Amino acid sequence: MGLLRFAKNVGKSLFGDDDDDAVATEALTKELDDLGLDAAGVEVKKEGEEVVLSGAAASQSLKEKIMTALGNVKGISGVQDNTEGGTEGVFHTVEKGDTLWAIAEKAMGNGAKYEEIFEANKPMLTHPDKIYPGQVLRIPV
């Protein structure tokens, strides 16, 4: 799939700037567990400001959730998807003033489909109104 870019200076803080990649990788893997995302078969490794994924996820949807969960972490500028199979996902970077309704209108042609975007981004999203500029969201297709 390639490299998916994220805003490095926004997101959940899981590790410090001085933590080495091994410590950060452990924190990222724990975050997936805490979110209830089954990353069995997917190897997660932090390399500099990027996360590299390899192996195979159970589904395309799960792989995309793993990518957005890890990429929306403070200090991560990209997720390199080297996993087996799958297709190119559709993503949207939240801009100032965006709402899920507006994103659904733009990406899916119908603002009322905002709930589909919300569901596609659970458990990272806990409420449809809790999005922030720089956050990357999955758009279900």
Task: State what each model feature region is.
Residues A69, V73-T87, E115-V141:
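Extracellular LysM carbohydrate-binding repeats and other cell-envelope/extracellular binding modules
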Residues E47-V52, A57, T83-G111, E115:
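Primarily a LysM-type cell-wall glycan-binding module
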Residues I66-T68, V94, K106-G109, Y132, ...:
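Surface-exposed beta-strand edges and their flanking turn/coil or helix-capping segments
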Residues S61, A112, T126:
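Residues that form or flank phosphate/diphosphate-binding pockets in enzymes
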Residues L62, T99, V136:
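Residue-level recognition of oxygen-bearing side chains
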Residues M1-G85, K130:
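Secretory N-termini
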